[in-house]
Amino acid sequence: MELTYTIKRSSRRRKLTITVERDRSVVVHAPESTSEEKIRAVVESKRQWIYEKTGHVQKYALPHPPGKEMVNGESALYLGRQYQIEMVRDGSEKIRFEQRFLIPAHLSDERRQVLRSWYMDRAKEKILPRARKFAVDLGVAFANARIVDNRYRWGSCTTRDNIRFNWRLIKAPMYVVDYVIIHELAHLLEANHTPRFWNIVRAQSPKMDKAKQWLLENGQILEEEI
């Protein structure tokens, strides 16, 4: 069976690596000068590993889970807990969070986008400062950090030392958020998922295994449309 994959080349990359995204797509990250023949040979040598990864329970195909109705009595996830949604008529212009989501009733037509924007704001407020803190702890420096809308990755670290985090992470428990932050920052010390890489992550994220298991079991819930 032929393997389909996308090649992404970079003049800054020194090693060839293969990743399997959460939509089961295979991406080969290669130095600029790597020949097609070498890439094919490496992919072929990793065929069994790729099959195992694409069949992993965490890799699931579109469509994504259906969204919520966003009405009174429903709940929405935030930092690992479900909180009730309440539509209120109090003249307010934005969502308030008081151990429940208080959403202005007059914004009901835009309530999905309003809650999505609220999540984005909370992600910027909580994730980015923690990224700066953990960078200091690890003794690394990144070019910039951003919260993005990325369907298939919780986080990423580019060859230009930019780090990106999926806004949906803000729905997960904080120890899971911290694990993803540390995971991406560790790539600034070790590009590949080597034993050294995992030792770095585990030293800073004692709950690494628990966090990975949480994402394995709950990742699809984070993907629910709002």
PLM region spans:
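Active-site-proximal or metal-binding-adjacent scaffold patches in catalytic folds
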Residues: 1-179, 188-226
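Walker B catalytic acidic pair
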Residues: 184
